[in-house]
């Protein structure tokens, strides 16, 4: 493995950032420098940091797609999970000690069930709106799969391992479950309905569970009907108990322009009074959508929720909560009407100490025997898609694409991670080993509208090809914007064909979802290729970035598939 300047940076040495296409230096947009001395040292992103280092934070605390977040607490430790739909592994598990700085520590699901059903991409299906709880030294996560029912996994360590998913309640359209262990030992579950599968929506129900919270034993009881209370599209239920009241937190009004309501009752089955407690108001924080209430050891209450930011997905916000007359008031309630507005900057939670700044990892040197936790596949993975190597690279074996292939939407072996914010550069070093079969390895920014730059073999030459696709889920054909053969070039002082060396693929991601790709043969001079393209969100998720290695079906090409070696992937 060639330890050039970028590799040293991948070892978490100081990075200085610039968005210039023709040089490889970097600086954090927040003015903070990234320093990472090893795997046990806090990783700090060079592109987005919420903690301002002065006792305050800015929202979003994670400017990445953590949809439908939920949080549980164990002492001074907080654990968060979020919707992952059909990304595998799924159910990301993040840890924090101050609710602002978060580290990705594992996943709750390593394989989606039914296994064969999710062996191919099922965009927008899978894991919806999980609920994480800690009870009697066990961690529980419940979620709804709108096509199969409500599942759960358990663990004694939130970093894993977690049990295999077990079906708690079968049915179509059952979503957004939340579990409550009551003071008398009884267990209850609330959930909502997906109208696309069940034919009903905007309502929340509660039913009693068995003592192990493994299956329901009581009838569904309607507790909130948003259809008659002006809270259409009510969903995302979270069930709590505080000071003798039962509370159901839920968003209504839709993801983009909705609000937060809270229903409360002295009795588990109601009747429930309903109140709006958080709305956009005159801020630029649209939505404020579903999330989780948590209380620190110091007695402070906080609400973590998401904001829909289109191509970035559903980013994570943190708002203070004040309890007034038994009702939570979220954010800042300037006019005293009981409904707050979300904050942009605020004093950090009182957790009794000051902790290091930390963010989820983005870059990867592929020096570990396991994939970095930031990566996930587009479907249940198959053996042979990827192998870490003792030589310090990731080997991606080409997967034959479908005979009906027109774009990447239904390719299962896309290795992707979340877009970390709306301005950054991602660069990767790849080598392609082809067996004459038009294999290709690519860097992609993926969504319903996507763009990619690939290195491929065709007609005895290696080519760089820049493509984009609009409305990929509709089966639209890719458009080729540039196709460039790689030839020996004295400018790079490479005596042989460039594909025998590493080829460096780069994308500069800009506000508005704009992408400019470039390439280099020496990792010093980068040349733009193709055109600036606009990408969009996927099905219920933001755009993602990552890698792929594919080949035409053998029945078409008559050739054996090849492979690619990925040396590193740097985000700055």
Role assignments for model-derived ranges:
Residues 3-9:
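Short, Lys/Arg-enriched N-terminal segments with co-localized hydrophobic residues
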Residues 9-16:
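Sec-dependent signal peptide recognition
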Residues 22-24:
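C-terminal motif of bacterial Sec signal peptides marking the signal peptidase cleavage site
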Residues 26-572:
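Carbohydrate-active catalytic/glycan-binding domains of CAZyme proteins
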